[in-house]
A protein has these predicted regions:
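Short beta-strand micro-motifs in enzyme catalytic cores
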Residues: 66, 135, 170-174, 203-207, ...
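N-terminal, active-site-proximal structural segment of metallo-dependent hydrolase catalytic domains
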Residues: 8-161, 165-170, 237-240
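Flexible, glycine-rich surface segments
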Residues: 215-242
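Surface-exposed cleft-lining segments at the edges of enzyme active sites
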Residues: 89-95, 123-125, 189-199, 227-237
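Conserved beta strand-loop-helix elements of the APE1-like EEP
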Residues: 141-144, 167-184, 211-212
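Active-site catalytic loop in hydrolytic enzyme cores
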Residues: 179-220
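Short, solvent-exposed loop/turn segments at secondary-structure junctions
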Residues: 72-75, 124-126, 154-156, 179-182, ...
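Short, basic/glycine-rich phosphate-binding loops at helix/coil junctions
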Residues: 80-89, 183, 223-228
Length: 242
């Protein structure tokens, strides 16, 4: 006499399915954490920055210098933006054509103002949010007879938040100068985030440039930086004390 095979109850099948789903989610989450940890951007404390272009203009004691500082919002935070960090609903706040148009207009305004030193923040080099447009290269051509330097402060292979996610980030700050710099360097600032949030967040820095002042043995030092926009003050004070 053969015994009949026992049938699994619907409840057991249900719990098994739930277990498999939870296991898949856990494995995917662990894989994501491992990926963003392994690909985390870890800049040195101090890094020498390459100088692009070739300016021959010097500076001497008593000269007047015109300066401009501009957070361009990676060419995508114009009057049409509905950005989630400002209480809006969108991650991608502009079309690709709008970003291109904005960067072109920004370059035009820099040429019009013609500053000796232009410090720009939130400049994307290869980011999903600005359609991977190399804004550094385009803005670096804004003025003839100038040079520029770029310091990265946000690099992540994949930023998993919000929904839809930000994705790839490669952004920073840049300085365009008519004055010939004898050096430029990136100096890291303290990171206010802990692991794992730190792995996909900004690594803020100072972009420090130096130009010799003729006949004095001294230097003109100009520092570009971009601090927290959504900080209540503690993080900014910590970095300024640094």
């Amino acid at each position: 006499m053969h015994s009949r095979p026992m049938k699994r109850s619907p409840m057991k099948r249900f719990f098994k399915a739930i277990f498999i789903i939870v296991l898949i989610i856990a494995i995917a989450f662990a894989g994501l954490i491992a990926f963003i940890s392994l690909t985390e951007y870890k800049p040195d404390k101090v890094e020498r920055i390459r100088i692009y272009g070739n300016s021959s203009k010097g500076v001497k004691k008593g000269d007047s210098i015109k300066m401009m500082s501009w957070n361009i919002g990676y060419g995508a935070l114009g009057d049409n933006a509905d950005f989630f960090m400002d209480g809006g609903n969108h991650v991608l706040t502009s079309s690709k054509n709008r970003v291109k148009k904005n960067i072109k207009s920004i370059s035009g305004e820099i040429r019009k103002q013609s500053p000796d030193i232009t410090m720009i923040q939130e400049v994307d080099k290869d980011s999903r949010r600005s359609y991977y447009i190399n804004q550094v290269e385009k803005l670096g051509k804004a003025m003839d007879g100038s040079e520029y330097y770029y310091a990265r402060n946000y690099k992540a292979a994949f930023v998993p938040y919000p929904i839809p996610p930000l994705g790839k980030m490669d952004s920073g700050i840049m300085t365009i100068s008519r004055l010939k710099a004898n050096s430029a360097k990136r100096v890291s600032l303290p990171v206010s985030f802990t692991w794992p949030v730190r792995t996909v967040n900004l690594k803020r820095c100072l972009l420090i440039s130096r130009t010799k002042v003729k006949g004095t043995g001294k230097e003109l030092v100009y520092i570009n930086l971009h601090l927290e926009a959504y900080d209540k003050g503690a993080g900014k004070r910590h970095r300024l004390e640094h």
